[in-house]
Amino acid sequence: MSEFLLIVHVLAAATWIGASVLTGFAGPRMAREGGPAALGWARVSREASLKVFNPAAGLTALSGILLVVLGDDYDWSDSFVTIGLTVVVITGIIGSVVHRPDAQKIIAALESSDYPTATEAGKRAAIWGALTIALLIVTVSVMVMKTGAG
């Protein structure tokens, strides 16, 4: 069971990070295209948060928790477990407080041709997105190294 959970954990984290990197790469390029391309990308990104990011993050957290609860290899006192859970909480807050409202703001601004507002919100989303990616990369690193494992 623990091997299956570990596979699920790794695949979910890879999906989460991969989608984040793709969004960080494609988002600014689509924004520079402007008009319908930028609006289409903004809508796809908002939908991806509900259908890709949130499920991948949730599955990463759930499978990680189950690895600790059901297995003997990991413990709540392991630093990498604490770091992983902390990053899930932090990125959840970033998603709720920054990404979700900014996505709505970008879409509304693009729909009304308010490009300065869309650009400002897009830059803010890009900065917080880069921070999220950095947090996820650090988390994967401490997971692989099993930092602080008992």
What positions do the PLM features span?
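Polytopic transmembrane helical bundles with strong interfacial aromatic enrichment
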Residues: 1-150
